[in-house]
Amino acid sequence: MVEEETESPGPKKCGPYISSVTSQSVNLMIRGVVLFFIGVFLALVLNLLQIQRNVTLFPPDVIASIFSSAWWVPPCCGTASAVIGLLYPCIDRHLGEPHKFNREWSNVMRCVAVFVGINHASAKLDFDNNIQLSLTLAALSVGLWWTFDRSRSGFGLGVGIAFLATVVTQLLVYNGVYQYTSPDFLYVRSWLPCIFFAGGITMGNIGRQLAMYECKVIAEKSHQE
């Protein structure tokens, strides 16, 4: 009788593994949405900076009207930002290469500020030739990685992102999907890979910080249970 009473049915609860998987999938979606909107916002901000140089990747009226011919560019940047931001912490876990620095949102915000500054420099500074511009922006981009990342996976992924994004952008231009407003096409190609590299490092840092915050919340919940 005692055994029957102890085995009396009650409301069954999900095991810790199932609840953990569910919460992780929800948090993954939340992180993806946050990264998407951050990417869209940065795309619009950086485009405003490039308008000063008249070399925008999409026409200025894309901000004023959603029916612009290049309305799809900010959502594409947001999607790429979400993928990059989710990919960085995933690769860190698989490679077992934790970040070397104590992560804080203040460091992430400084990284974003430096990235915007690099883009602003590409729009404002005048150089004698495109090689000087490329070398300067490359040094600034590598400096951003060294200051806020320093991981081999981050550098490799940043280089891969820069190469792939530059190739895709040039293919879109060659196929007439959209075109640069600057007549100096070589000038655009001289800074584009560096901007993509710095952008990949920046979104990777944001994604890592969001993932770290998620792990901290899950650990606190499991500790309370």
Curated annotation (Swiss-Prot):
<dbReference type="InterPro" id="IPR025929">
    <property type="entry name" value="INSIG_fam"/>
</dbReference>
<comment type="function">
    <text>Oxysterol-binding protein that mediates feedback control of cholesterol synthesis by controlling both endoplasmic reticulum to Golgi transport of SCAP and degradation of HMGCR. Acts as a negative regulator of cholesterol biosynthesis by mediating the retention of the SCAP-SREBP complex in the endoplasmic reticulum, thereby blocking the processing of sterol regulatory element-binding proteins (SREBPs) SREBF1/SREBP1 and SREBF2/SREBP2.</text>
</comment>
<feature type="transmembrane region" description="Helical; Name=5">
    <location>
        <begin position="154"/>
        <end position="175"/>
    </location>
</feature>
<feature type="topological domain" description="Cytoplasmic">
    <location>
        <begin position="89"/>
        <end position="103"/>
    </location>
</feature>
<keyword id="KW-1133">Transmembrane helix</keyword>
<feature type="topological domain" description="Lumenal">
    <location>
        <begin position="127"/>
        <end position="129"/>
    </location>
</feature>
<keyword id="KW-0597">Phosphoprotein</keyword>
<protein>
    <recommendedName>
        <fullName>Insulin-induced gene 2 protein</fullName>
    </recommendedName>
</protein>
<keyword id="KW-0472">Membrane</keyword>
<keyword id="KW-0446">Lipid-binding</keyword>
<dbReference type="GO" id="GO:0008142">
    <property type="term" value="F:oxysterol binding"/>
</dbReference>
<keyword id="KW-0558">Oxidation</keyword>
<dbReference type="GO" id="GO:0032933">
    <property type="term" value="P:SREBP signaling pathway"/>
</dbReference>
<keyword id="KW-0256">Endoplasmic reticulum</keyword>
<keyword id="KW-1207">Sterol metabolism</keyword>
<keyword id="KW-0882">Thioester bond</keyword>
<feature type="transmembrane region" description="Helical; Name=6">
    <location>
        <begin position="190"/>
        <end position="207"/>
    </location>
</feature>
<comment type="subunit">
    <text>Interacts with SCAP; interaction is direct and only takes place in the presence of sterols; it prevents interaction between SCAP and the coat protein complex II (COPII). Associates with the SCAP-SREBP complex (composed of SCAP and SREBF1/SREBP1 or SREBF2/SREBP2); association is mediated via its interaction with SCAP and only takes place in the presence of sterols. Interacts with RNF139. Interacts with RNF145.</text>
</comment>
<feature type="topological domain" description="Cytoplasmic">
    <location>
        <begin position="149"/>
        <end position="153"/>
    </location>
</feature>
<dbReference type="Pfam" id="PF07281">
    <property type="entry name" value="INSIG"/>
</dbReference>
<feature type="cross-link" description="Glycyl cysteine thioester (Cys-Gly) (interchain with G-Cter in ubiquitin); alternate">
    <location>
        <position position="215"/>
    </location>
</feature>
<dbReference type="GO" id="GO:0036316">
    <property type="term" value="P:SREBP-SCAP complex retention in endoplasmic reticulum"/>
</dbReference>
<dbReference type="GO" id="GO:0032869">
    <property type="term" value="P:cellular response to insulin stimulus"/>
</dbReference>
<dbReference type="GO" id="GO:0006695">
    <property type="term" value="P:cholesterol biosynthetic process"/>
</dbReference>
<feature type="topological domain" description="Cytoplasmic">
    <location>
        <begin position="208"/>
        <end position="225"/>
    </location>
</feature>
<keyword id="KW-0153">Cholesterol metabolism</keyword>
<keyword id="KW-0753">Steroid metabolism</keyword>
<feature type="topological domain" description="Lumenal">
    <location>
        <begin position="176"/>
        <end position="189"/>
    </location>
</feature>
<feature type="modified residue" description="Phosphoserine">
    <location>
        <position position="151"/>
    </location>
</feature>
<feature type="site" description="Required for the recognition of 25-hydroxycholesterol">
    <location>
        <position position="115"/>
    </location>
</feature>
<feature type="transmembrane region" description="Helical; Name=2">
    <location>
        <begin position="71"/>
        <end position="88"/>
    </location>
</feature>
<feature type="short sequence motif" description="KxHxx">
    <location>
        <begin position="219"/>
        <end position="225"/>
    </location>
</feature>
<feature type="transmembrane region" description="Helical; Name=1">
    <location>
        <begin position="29"/>
        <end position="51"/>
    </location>
</feature>
<keyword id="KW-0832">Ubl conjugation</keyword>
<feature type="modified residue" description="Cysteine sulfenic acid (-SOH); alternate">
    <location>
        <position position="215"/>
    </location>
</feature>
<feature type="transmembrane region" description="Helical; Name=4">
    <location>
        <begin position="130"/>
        <end position="148"/>
    </location>
</feature>
<feature type="transmembrane region" description="Helical; Name=3">
    <location>
        <begin position="104"/>
        <end position="126"/>
    </location>
</feature>
<feature type="topological domain" description="Cytoplasmic">
    <location>
        <begin position="1"/>
        <end position="28"/>
    </location>
</feature>
<comment type="similarity">
    <text>Belongs to the INSIG family.</text>
</comment>
<keyword id="KW-0812">Transmembrane</keyword>
<keyword id="KW-0443">Lipid metabolism</keyword>
<feature type="topological domain" description="Lumenal">
    <location>
        <begin position="52"/>
        <end position="70"/>
    </location>
</feature>
